[in-house]
Amino acid sequence: MRKSGLIFFLAFVVPIGFALWWWGTFADARIEIVERGPYRYAYGVYSGDYSKIPRWKAEVTQALNAHKITRGTPVTALLDDPRMTAVPERRVEIGYLIAADARVAAPLRVGEIPRRRVVLVRVEASPLMAPGKAYAALIEYAATNNIVFRLPTFELYRDGVLEVEMAL
């Protein structure tokens, strides 16, 4: 390898490869069937482009902080399949797990999910990469195992790991 090729490799290829690895581009989804829940969460309901989820999450964070409610793990419930639902009609619940005794005021709502059997998909990747990897794996797993892909799914974000639950 010539010197210029080595410099190019070290200056461009290695950093780009490292960044892709850091973001989780090469991460695999892990899938299992488990019992999960129960959960209690405070959330807001939003409609539109899922790319706005970070902005909507900030609104929920502000509302919880204003009411001095301790936020737990961030959660999202996708209510509509983006493959079959027009962008303006896509609905999502965005929020945080909360304590059993937390009192939530409007505009937020309280959701409760009982303990149930789910297909659980875990992906350790950046928030930009993880959902695509998780849902692709979940849809493939469902098709391969004759399981109907159904919504809503429930997502939890813990320590850089996205966990997507689909009830069975």
What is each model feature region?
Residues 2-168:
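A solvent-exposed interaction/effector surface
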